[in-house]
UniProtKB/Swiss-Prot annotation:
Biased composition (Acidic residues): 592-609
Regions crossing the membrane: 40-60, 104-124, 137-157, 166-186, 264-284, 301-321
Coiled-coil ranges (or none): 640-672
Location in the cell: Plastid, Chloroplast membrane
Gene: ycf78
Lineage: Eukaryota, Viridiplantae, Chlorophyta, Nephroselmidophyceae, Nephroselmidales
Protein name according to UniProt: Uncharacterized membrane protein ycf78
Ranges where the record places region Disordered: 580-609
Amino acid sequence: MALAQESVFSVLYHLKHDPVDYWFHNWVLHGPMLFRSIGSGIVNFCTFQWVGWLIHLPIVRPDALASLFHEYDLPSSIEAGATPIRGMLTISQTVPTTAGMDPFLLGIMNSPALVISISTTTILCLRWLSLDLRWAAILAFFGNFLSNWLVVVAVLFGLDDLVARWYFLTPFTYVGSVLFIWYLVYKWIKVGLNFDLTSKGPFGMNPEVWRGLKIGMTGFTLGLCEQTVLFHKLIQPLSPHQLDLLHGFTSGTVRDHIVMHGAYVIGLFVGGVFLGSVILSVLIPAVDTWSEKKLLTQARFSLLLIMMTGASLPYYGFDYLLTRFADFAPDGGWRESTIFKPSLNKHLVSKNIHRKFTIADSTRRDTARPWREARNLFPERRWLLKVGTKSKAKLSTLPILDFVTHWRGGEDFVYSIVNPADFYRDLTKDPLQGKGKTLDKAVWKFVGNFFYQWKDEDLSRRKFQEQVKGIVDYARYRMVVINDIHVKGLVTTEQGDIRGVVDQHADMKLLQLPEAFVNQRLVKPPFLKHDWVLTIPKMSEQAKEERLLLKRQKMPPELSIEQQKTFFDSNAQKLFGTPNHYGLPEALDSSLESEEENLDPEEDIDPEIVDPLSSEESKTIDTLKVDLRTLSKNAKWVPKSVIQKQAAEKAEEERKAEEEKLLAVRNAKKKGLTVPKTEPKKGLTKQRQANPLGTPSLFYDKLHKRAEWNNEDFPHWGYMYHQLWKHRAYSHFMFRRLLEVDVDSMLARQPSRNFVTDADYQRLQYHQVALSSYHRSLRDYETSLWNVLLEPRANFFLAPNPLWRWDADWKVGFRAKSLENYVYDQRFKGTHRVVQRLFLLDTQFNPWDKTGPQFRYDQLLPLEEQDKGDRSNLWHEEIPREVRENVGAYDPFESQRVPPMFDPVPFYIGWDPILRKSVLTTSRLPKGTARVKLVLPGTQTPKWLKFIVSLESSDS
């Protein structure tokens, strides 16, 4: 209801002032979001969630788009999250408050939330109405409304300290409320329903007047007691940077706020009185009708039950019962814990987003549905079990899920399958699809209970046994090219054949030590189906150290090529069989066979002609094979730069050898010698078809080509879904809105004036430079290689619980309530930390100046020591030291670079005295023009100066 009123009011206002700009920005740019909010409002209305809206404090923003930003898309604060609470505690500054009319109309629109309140006082009003005491019911209603109205006035005009003190008295108010209600019950049972009519007023007061005052004071007192529900919503989300949202005197002049807040409270009072009179005019005839039908006896017991229940719920009112009757969820997330959340399908990712980074609405349905139907993927939607309704629907209009599915179930995320790598691999094109074998459908259950299973387990095992034959060659290739796979002791051997795991719970005999699987990032090939990695037991730290010590004793840190060759062969024979004449196992030999030239033994060959298979050349090939094994074995410690350097050197050596060979052949022809015939080289495509790994030289000089082939064959390899979401969120227009409103506005909401000395003013200038330097580091960090989202843990596939495979420290990630919260927390991580160091936001002990005084929120921290010479703390926490020294030395991949979505010119926020609103600008704008008296300490006679404090930097 409040959302609909805000939308109507915003439409009327903008159409009156600038219709062209309104239609372009709000319907063309923000139209889909508005339609989505309307649909969400209809769903919430059908599920009776609007009952909870009536109880909240109704200080909402009149601008529809601002309300949508705060409630659905933008994280309003890191501590409180994207909850509607901050939106209700904020008075809009985006709409000009001309002549104070907007706050007045806003107060009239918000008055129903204070009038229509289900409370103990409301029950008393109905009781007095049932006794045909109309004037008593009116007085009780007015007392209740007046108490609620006074609390709102106290909050708006800066009396939040008084509200906080009253909040600490909530236990006593509840005890008093319960005792008073039980007193009424006692009098009700002993005297009867008409005990109020027999009471007499003190000091000779007229009984009618005394009863009226007593009833009015009763409603007022109970209304204050029941304000603990509102206090909980007021005090709970407070944080140091939200204090100005309550008292509102940090910018502008006092006159502006008096006019703005005064118009709002007047409109709230007028609307409440008018609506209350309308409600009473409807209830009084209804009660008269009920009295004639003699329903007072039945209504009496129900009212008594409601009174006793409502007064016995601490920190909650009747809204707790009406909005949480099914599951009794926590108070802070009653909208987030429902399946009707507007961001229901934000976790779904298009199957082609890894190539385009954007989704085209016109092609989403055409590309997703055939791909889904070809794989027999039909989701099944199940609602909450407590509701008891079920329905099935095809997601024909939604993008298909192509990566790891997650969902918020309660407070945690639950993966849809045991192994995420298996899921996004199985959704690729199945090699057995054209042979008459189909896969079982994927069943998706809402909410928080996803699972993915295969019906034919035998088919999965057979495919695993067939496809695992090439795992050694593939793993070896990936170790050399990608340098992120470390596979040792993958499967057991039985009579020379590689055997797969029959069951996850079966005993798995490993010929090599299992520490190769512990604390390593193991990336499985896409064709490996069975989740056999999770069957390996955990190892204690002591066992790891003992195994590592034993391994070091067996193999010294520095070995010659012959020693390494001997050690490798002795261990490889156990796993892969007897080595061949090249010194390599047979499983690895097929990829290293070189083409021998067909030499005619009868022809005389000049000794000057270089024989490609001479002793030196053969030694070079053997050395190359040993180097390849060394790289494969120690790929974990070989950086990519070393591999690229070796590849370039090897390519240069082969080029020179080819030139020398051609020169020798040319000289032989000039001398009339017979040149041996050689077979023509196969093309690159034929080489790839005949031998996917190619010759040993292709590991080096064709390194980039191999990477392209790998991307074509396995497009999902090594590409995490959160990187796709990062590009999608950063490319959205709301990201810029978030930067302008939530970041710079928070930094700019420093006090507009202070009693400062010259030393304090110098410290202020220092902190201005510090914050500017910090924001410059953020802009450098945006194009840095390190600007990526959370990386998987080192033992990604070894974690027993899929929830533990991401972000070992749980810094942000899955604690965020939405995708935008996740991006916001990751992008601006450390911003508040630096600001708290520069401008201490609370009265806690100052850790950076243990000998200095304590500072408040609006005071400055002392100047840092200059003899240290370390300005690294002004940089972002995730930027390494080498990047700080030379930011432009790194050239990250295009897939890891975040596109800059805003200009490098920072935005400032300030108070415009003409428009009487906070405005965003790229130029320096003073906050106010009022002259402030300044007291200089250290003088016997105060010297008053005129001083103007202006906003001179982007962050203070």
